[in-house]
Amino acid sequence: MAVQRTFSIIKPDAVAKNVIGEITTRFEKAGLKVVASKLKQLSKAEAEGFYAEHSARGFFGDLVAFMISGPVVVQVLEGENAIALNRELMGATNPKEAAAGTIRADFAESIDANAVHGSDSEAAAAREISYFFAATEVTAR
């Protein structure tokens, strides 16, 4: 397996619950390294741009409103098979369907307020990382 980078957002609901450290610890215990991180209040334009692929879908307005409802933590994670590993750690999008012990099963409230976002492919990871981080802000460790 190759070392990959993936993008993660700890969403407003999880930030409000003060579980940033608990979520990040799960990434690290699984072998992922945080190589970039920012606590950030997204603007409406940033949220709309980030989720542009969903702009024609009915939930887009609610998604944008949720993502700007409070601060988020944007992170770049690095490790062996990082994209798949992060998705496994997160669990199913709907926390009611997420396996016990996953981040969403433990911290998410609903399919909308589902605690975390993670890249679903190498192409998405590259796009999402560059959306929030300059190359000089990502530091190998």
UniProtKB/Swiss-Prot annotation:
The keyword Transcription regulation does not apply. It comes from Pseudomonas fluorescens (strain SBW25). The keyword Repeat does not apply. Keywords: ATP-binding, Cytoplasm, Kinase, Magnesium, Metal-binding, Nucleotide metabolism, Nucleotide-binding, Phosphoprotein, Transferase. SUPFAM superfamilies: Nucleoside diphosphate kinase, NDK. The gene is ndk. InterPro entries: NDK-like_dom (IPR034907), NDK-like_dom_sf (IPR036850), Nucleoside_diP_kinase (IPR001564), Nucleoside_diP_kinase_AS (IPR023005). Belongs to the NDK family. Its cofactor is Mg(2+). The active site is at H117 (pros-phosphohistidine intermediate). Homotetramer. This is Nucleoside diphosphate kinase. GO terms for molecular function: ATP binding; metal ion binding; nucleoside diphosphate kinase activity. ATP binds at K11, F59, R87, T93, R104, N114. One of its GO terms (biological process) is CTP biosynthetic process. It catalyses: a 2'-deoxyribonucleoside 5'-diphosphate + ATP = a 2'-deoxyribonucleoside 5'-triphosphate + ADP; a ribonucleoside 5'-diphosphate + ATP = a ribonucleoside 5'-triphosphate + ADP.
